[in-house]
């Protein structure tokens, strides 16, 4: 949300066209969306507790580059780094939310989602106060928040590692799916189409309006 919020500044500084603004959104979305299932698939097989602070390090790198960017190419790379941070962070963070739920998986996931939505809504407000009056160089102030997040996530990763070691020797529960495979595929396909259409409109509106 922070990158979207400073599109007017980027457009003014680099004289961006609508196509170039769309390319920034595309770069971020590709890095944050398409890479995420790959990371999730890998961490299902090989859990990576330290991917939480590692993901935030990618985000921090993207913010630093965005603050210092002197060209459109650097802005694209910054967007890719921030998106990669999201991809690396979210699969394992969802697992941590489930592990910490105490069996109340729905509540834990809801709180996790609310936290993300709150951050997304807060980003533009902070950008209006901290960045808009002074220029995109002030994006560097958000690096402090990223550094604090890395410290907190490192502690969570230690807890996650300890929990993983404790559960490593326990037999995994057998999951029985009573639904036919074709019905599962159909339901997931419909869900993907709905999500795609939702974010298609959201990205279009937020990028240009």
Label the model's feature ranges.
Residues 73-79, 191:
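Short hydrophobic/alpha-helical segments at membrane-entry points of transmembrane helices
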Residues 3-4, 186-209:
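Extracytoplasmic gate region of multi-pass secondary transporters
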Residues 78-115:
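Cytoplasmic helix-loop-helix junction between adjacent transmembrane helices
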Residues 155-179:
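Flexible cytoplasmic inter-helical loops of multi-pass small-molecule transporters
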Residues 29-37, 120-121:
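Residue-level signature of mid-helix packing/kink "hotspots" within the transmembrane helices
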